[in-house]
């Protein structure tokens, strides 16, 4: 991996996976299991640096979690510094879709809702067990990986870490889990309000 990251790469529009307010995500041109996140020219990398510090803390403690995508390091690109992450894919090889995609495509959601309900319960329990620190849980920052284990898997791909000057959640699993309780309450409320889906049992609510 060190040898790979030491070599500059060229990213092209055809490799674009998604683009947000802060940065864009591209397929890695040499590794199909990786993606490269690059900040837009008018944005700084403050949020990403915060996130990377949290990843380094996790790895320094020799711990990880199957609920978050892996981080591998930086690599120079023609668009500036790239941050290289695991690219979450379905068993078919397709890039896994975000929860936002599933919830906006109701027929697709209905097809998978039974397994998604089970996978969500496992996701929630695992995050609490691992005391993962996240700024917020958002439907476009979580993907549902089809074909993983019997019921698929939810994975956070963005917005990890804490923006607090003193990130106390890093030092106390109890405090981290207290924060997670609020994060999940906000997340489930948001899903209900925006998509009319009660995430606790994954049923679409009619108006």
PLM region descriptions:
Residues 105-115, 119-121, 126-132, 144-207:
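C-lobe/activation-segment region of protein kinase-like
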Residues 137-144:
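Catalytic-loop Lys-Pro-X-Asn motif of eukaryotic-like protein kinases
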Residues 35-41, 86-88, 158-160:
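Active-site ExK catalytic segment of metal-dependent nucleases
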């Amino acid at each position: 991996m060190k040898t790979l990251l030491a070599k500059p790469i060229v990213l092209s529009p055809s490799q674009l996976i998604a683009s947000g307010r802060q940065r864009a995500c591209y397929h890695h041109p040499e590794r199909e299991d990786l993606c490269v996140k690059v900040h837009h020219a008018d944005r700084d990398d403050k949020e990403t640096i915060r996130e990377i510090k949290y990843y380094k803390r996790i790895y320094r403690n020799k711990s990880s979690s199957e609920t978050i995508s892996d981080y591998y390091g930086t690599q120079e690109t023609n668009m500036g510094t790239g941050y290289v992450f695991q690219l979450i894919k379905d068993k078919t090889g397709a890039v896994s879709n975000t929860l936002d995609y599933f919830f906006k495509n109701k027929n697709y959601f209905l097809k998978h809702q039974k397994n998604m309900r089970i996978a969500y319960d496992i996701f929630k329990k695992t995050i609490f067990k691992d005391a993962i620190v996240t700024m917020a849980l958002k439907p476009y920052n979580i993907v549902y990986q089809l074909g993983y284990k019997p019921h698929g898997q939810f994975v956070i791909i963005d917005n990890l870490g804490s923006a607090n000057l003193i990130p106390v959640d890093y030092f106390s699993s109890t405090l981290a889990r207290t924060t997670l309780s609020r994060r999940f309450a906000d997340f489930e409320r948001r899903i209900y309000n925006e998509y009319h889906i009660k995430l606790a049992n994954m049923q679409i609510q009619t108006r």
